[in-house]
C-alpha cells in the first residue's frame, strides 16, 4: 500500500501540470528597465545604460573618502588646461599655497550650480586661509565663462575636454559609468594631497569638509 501511494504521488501528469496563476510575475529585465531617460543632478543617461547592467563596485554610498590613481599623501601629476578666459593654467603655478581642486560633472546642472555657488559664498574663508579654489569639468572655456559670469564665480574654472586629467587622476564615475564623478582634492603648500572627498548626492558638503582641512593645514 505504501508503494502504491508513492507511485500515485509521482504521476507524470502531476509533475508536468502548470500551476494556475492569476498573473505572471514581472521579469528581472522589466523590473530594471527605467523610463526613456533617467535624470540625475541635471544630467541624463540613456535607458540602455541600465538594461541588465552588472552591479557596480560598491563604494561608501558615494560619499566620504574615495581614492583613485591619486591618493592621500601623493603628489599628483601636473597638468595644463585652459581657464574660463581661454588662458592656459598649470597646476604647478599654485605651488606654495593650499589648493582645493574639485572635479564636477557639468556647468549649469542643478547639483553643480549649488556646489559652485557654495564655493563662491565661502570663497573669502578659503582666501583668508591662503588657499586657491579650482573647478574642473569637461566643458569648454566658453561654457565656463558663461557659467562663471552668470553666478559671479570668483575662482578659476578649467576645461578638461576629453576628460584626460580626470582619467589621469582616477576620478571615479557614477551611474554605471555614465556620469562623471564629483570629487574634491585638498593639496597643501608642497602640492601633497592631504584629503580626498567624494559625494555626488550632496554637492554642498564638499565646502564644509574641505574648509575644515584647509583651516587646519
From Swiss-Prot:
Other remarks in the entry: The active site is a conserved redox-active cysteine residue, the peroxidatic cysteine (C(P)), which makes the nucleophilic attack on the peroxide substrate. The peroxide oxidizes the C(P)-SH to cysteine sulfenic acid (C(P)-SOH), which then reacts with another cysteine residue, the resolving cysteine (C(R)), to form a disulfide bridge. The disulfide is subsequently reduced by an appropriate electron donor to complete the catalytic cycle. In this atypical 2-Cys peroxiredoxin, C(R) is present in the same subunit to form an intramolecular disulfide.
Feature: transit peptide: 1-66
GO molecular function, one term: thioredoxin peroxidase activity
Any single GO BP term: cellular response to oxidative stress
Quaternary context: Monomer.
Localization: Plastid, Chloroplast thylakoid lumen
Catalytic activity: a hydroperoxide + [thioredoxin]-dithiol = an alcohol + [thioredoxin]-disulfide + H2O
The species this protein was found in: Triticum aestivum
Official protein name in the record: Peroxiredoxin Q, chloroplastic
Disulphide-bridged cysteine pairs: 112-117
Domain of life: Eukaryota
Thioredoxin domain segment(s): 70-217
Amino acid at each position: 500500500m505504501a508503494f502504491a501511494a508513492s507511485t500515485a504521488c509521482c504521476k507524470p501528469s502531476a509533475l508536468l501540470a502548470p500551476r494556475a496563476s492569476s498573473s505572471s510575475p514581472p521579469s528581472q529585465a522589466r523590473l530594471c528597465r527605467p523610463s526613456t531617460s533617467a535624470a540625475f543632478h541635471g544630467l541624463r543617461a540613456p535607458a540602455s545604460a541600465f538594461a541588465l547592467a552588472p552591479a557596480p563596485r560598491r563604494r561608501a554610498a558615494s560619499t566620504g573618502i574615495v581614492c583613485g590613481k591619486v591618493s592621500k599623501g601623493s603628489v599628483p601629476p601636473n597638468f595644463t588646461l585652459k581657464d574660463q578666459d581661454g588662458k592656459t593654467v598649470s597646476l604647478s603655478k599654485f605651488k606654495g599655497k593650499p589648493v582645493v581642486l574639485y572635479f564636477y560633472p557639468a556647468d549649469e546642472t542643478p547639483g553643480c550650480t549649488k556646489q559652485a555657488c557654495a564655493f563662491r559664498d565661502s570663497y573669502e574663508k578659503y582666501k583668508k586661509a591662503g588657499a586657491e579654489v579650482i573647478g574642473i569639468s569637461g566643458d569648454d572655456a566658453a561654457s565656463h565663462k558663461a557659467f562663471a559670469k552668470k553666478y559671479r564665480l570668483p575662482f578659476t574654472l578649467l576645461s578638461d575636454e576629453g576628460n584626460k586629467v580626470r582619467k589621469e587622476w582616477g576620478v571615479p564615475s557614477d551611474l554605471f559609468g555614465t556620469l562623471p564623478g564629483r570629487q574634491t582634492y585638498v593639496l597643501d603648500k608642497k602640492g601633497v594631497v592631504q584629503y580626498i572627498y567624494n559625494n555626488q548626492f550632496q554637492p554642498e558638503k564638499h565646502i564644509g569638509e574641505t574648509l575644515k582641512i584647509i583651516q587646519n593645514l
